[in-house]
Each structure stands twice: as C-alpha cells, then as structure tokens.
C-alpha cells in the first residue's frame, strides 16, 4: 500500500500537517475548497520562476492567510515589498474576505525538496535533455545535501517512444510503509512534443520519533 498511496496523505495526523487549516459548515465547505484550488493554481502560475514548493492556506473570520514556501523569497517579495502587494491585490479577486495576509517561508535546501526536484526534472525534459541524465543528476545533488534516500520515476512516451513506459531510479533507502519515516513527495508534469510525461520524486529525510510518548514514559518512571 505504501508504494501506491500519496506519502503526505498517509502521514497526515501522524507526522505531517494539513496544507489547508480551516473549518467550515456544509454550506461553505465546497466554495472554500474551490477557492483554495484556484488560489494554489494562480500562485503557482504567477510565481512559476520562484520555486514554490508548498502553499498553506489558513482561514479565520475575516481574513485569509497564505504561507508560501519558496526557494527564492526575494523574487516573491520584490523591491520594497511591491511583489507581495501586487499578489495581495490579485488574490482579493479569488476570496470574499476583507484581509489577505501573505507569509513567505524560505526553502533552505531546494536540492532536497521533492516538489522542486520534480519540477526541475520536468523542465529538463521539456528542454529535450535525456530523462536518465536528468533523474540521475537530481538524485546525486539530493544525496550530497544529506538526504538518506531518493527515488524518482518518469512515466510517458520517454524519448519519443511509440509505447509509453515508466522508468525509475533510486539511491539509498525509502521506507514508504513506515509512518514515522519523514518522506517528502513531489509530482510534476512535463509538456513535450510527444505528450505529457509525469514525474514523481520521493525523498527520505530520516525518522521523526514520537517525542510526546517518550516524555510521558520518563515522567512515569520518575
């Protein structure tokens, strides 16, 4: 099962958190969900060159807060915060709240971020670089930065082949079944002249141990 399911969804509530943090009644839930989808698509398209890996959306009574995780925060913020202000004005069209707050979070290690790695491979495929070379170089860079394991997969008409297939490469360990394993997952699509090629990346960053349970046991022993 661990090989098929989205690693983030499998670990939500265990070691991962939701990308959308809000509550709604049955009347507003569907409209909020559609708004979230539109916001994510718009921000990803507008900031496509800024390396946006993740967008968290929080909602309160009269405000919407966005936490944008990006590898190039300076490009998003702009001179004197002009980029942020322009983005706020655009986002007001998508939400019916009075305030839109934007918080920029820097992705410090972009070479080991699964989403950015997948997008990087997809961009190379669109430039007609060999998929084997693109995947192997991306894996090597991630392993050099301290990742414990990396797995990449490309699916589609690779190198213009008549029959679509899936090619995978991996290095290190990727324990997808272990819930305490910190697995980062990313997906991107490359639009080539032969059709779309799907790119998936899994990055293993070590285990996250349940610290709360350990603390309780220590207190009981004392």
From Swiss-Prot:
One of its GO terms (cellular component) is cytosolic small ribosomal subunit. SUPFAM superfamilies: Prokaryotic type KH domain (KH-domain type II), Ribosomal protein S3 C-terminal domain. GO terms for molecular function: mRNA binding; rRNA binding; structural constituent of ribosome. One of its GO terms (biological process) is translation. Keywords: Ribonucleoprotein, Ribosomal protein, RNA-binding, rRNA-binding. Part of the 30S ribosomal subunit. Forms a tight complex with proteins S10 and S14. Belongs to the universal ribosomal protein uS3 family. This is Small ribosomal subunit protein uS3. The gene is rpsC.
């Amino acid at each position: 099962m661990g090989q098929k399911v989205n690693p983030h969804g499998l670990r939500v509530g265990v070691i991962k958190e939701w990308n959308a943090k809000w509550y709604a009644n049955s009347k507003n839930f569907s409209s909020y969900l559609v708004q979230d989808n539109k916001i994510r698509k718009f921000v990803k398209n507008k900031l496509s060159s800024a390396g946006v890996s993740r967008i968290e959306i929080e909602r309160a009574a009269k405000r919407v807060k966005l936490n944008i995780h990006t590898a190039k925060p300076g490009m998003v913020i702009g001179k004197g915060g002009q980029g942020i202000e322009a983005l706020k004005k655009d986002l007001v069209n998508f939400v019916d709240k009075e305030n839109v707050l934007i918080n920029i979070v820097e992705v410090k290690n972009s070479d080991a971020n699964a989403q950015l790695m997948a997008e990087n491979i997809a961009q190379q495929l669109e430039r007609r670089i060999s998929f084997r070379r693109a995947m192997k170089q991306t894996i090597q860079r991630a392993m050099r930065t301290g990742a414990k394991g990396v797995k990449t997969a490309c699916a589609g008409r690779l190198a213009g082949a008549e029959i679509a297939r899936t090619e995978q490469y991996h290095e290190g360990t990727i324990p997808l079944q272990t819930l305490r394993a910190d697995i980062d997952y990313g997906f991107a699509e490359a639009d080539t002249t032969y059709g779309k090629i799907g790119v998936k990346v899994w990055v293993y960053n070590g285990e996250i141990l349940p610290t709360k349970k350990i603390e309780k046991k220590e207190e009981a022993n004392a």
